[in-house]
């Protein structure tokens, strides 16, 4: 597999997307709350940016990635920041690790790329130690912004048939195998885990014209607006741009 992330970040990054990336990284690392000597697995680690940051806690971190290209980029990044992260090639549906091996497993922005998210969740459950935690972060394809976007473009199509027909943020990217919203990710997770907390990150990313409006505002003003929207998104994951679910193994599992 030679998938790469070249198309993930657009050539021009809007203020709302920049904020989403930055805030997402910070809050997900907080959710993991890595501790010294914990064993942590990052499934679909990409460039291993999060894995490198997690290793700063003293945790033993392993990054799993199916793509040869991304593994190469991960090695470059880890070398550049001198992070002691081990890398392994493999897929989420068949994790190459023994059962009860990890204290925590993180899967950020990768579950919707897998052929079988259900098998992946089963495997994450298998490799976690009793009392272990899984932290799942996924793009919400039914966010408030995407609902507004779909409605806006339907109206545009009625009154302006020649309206822009390019790719839209609320359309499923070609490298995704499925789409998630709050209901579907909750249903999937609850098949294998007890949900400890579900939160939203960011609000209104991808709403038509929103990035352009923010670009016109002074930086302190737009940062304040984005921070307020992010705070508003936290208790409403069904409306947020990204959903983060922190969960634990069922207490009866030995």
Where are these regions (language model features)?
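A C-terminal cap/extension of S-adenosyl-L-methionine-dependent methyltransferases
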Residues: 183, 187, 197-254
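A short glycine-rich, Lys/Arg-flanked "PGG" loop and its adjoining helix->strand segment in the class I
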Residues: 118-130
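Conserved class I S-adenosyl-L-methionine
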Residues: 1-35, 37-46, 49-53, 70-73, 135-162
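A conserved beta-strand element that flanks and buttresses the S-adenosyl-L-methionine
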Residues: 106
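Acceptor-substrate binding/catalytic loop of class I
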Residues: 167-184
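Class I SAM-dependent methyltransferase SAM/SAH-binding core
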Residues: 47-94
